[in-house]
Amino acid sequence: MPTRRGLLAFAFGAAWAGRGVAAAEPTPGEDGLYHEPWFLQSFLDLREDLESAAAGGKRLAIMWELRGCPYCRETHLVNFADAGIASYIRDNFEVLQLNLIGSRKVTDFDRQELSEKELAQKYGIRYTPTFQFFPPSPDGLEAKDAIAREVARAPGYLKPQHFLSMFRFVRERAYERGSFRDFLAGNG
């Protein structure tokens, strides 16, 4: 006959074993950033990345991160772990991951080649995670000031519901009709 102690030990062991199976959490790469397998693998030419995304019927988003950023980790472990959110983003966006203090060379829309850190400074990126969203076409972007090239920006962590709403806001081009706050108010 099973004892209470035996049942408790079994339950604990089963829970512990199940935890190992479910532990498909992303882990940081060599650069200290969490990576999603579906993130855009790029030559870091923003014009080409935007053109490629548009050719595939998608929009371009840049995710700025920083090693050790707790809210970047939260974005990966909570927001991107939600199958519905991840699926919507994969189906509608190309997400380019950049490091706020990184040294990789990136070619901006105006053909200026900068380190990730210099590009972040040019666009006034100060918080991580920050998502930048760009128009469906690169036409005319090089003539605009850096920040004016964006159609939307999400500075800082957004809870999953608002996170998905921000991507919907951009995909549906709701920025042409009003602010993100207006979009949230009208879409629950």
For each of these PLM feature ranges, what is it?
Residues 56-69:
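Short active-site neighborhood of thiol/selenol oxidoreductases, capturing the structured segment around
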Residues 86-114:
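Thiol-based oxidoreductase modules, predominantly thioredoxin-like and allied folds used
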Residues 6-24:
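N-terminal export signals
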Residues 42-58:
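A short beta-strand-turn-helix
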Residues 127, 135-175:
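Non-catalytic, surface beta->alpha helical segment in thiol-disulfide oxidoreductase systems
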Residues 73-88:
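Typically the conserved alpha-helix immediately C-terminal to a functionally engaged Cys/Sec
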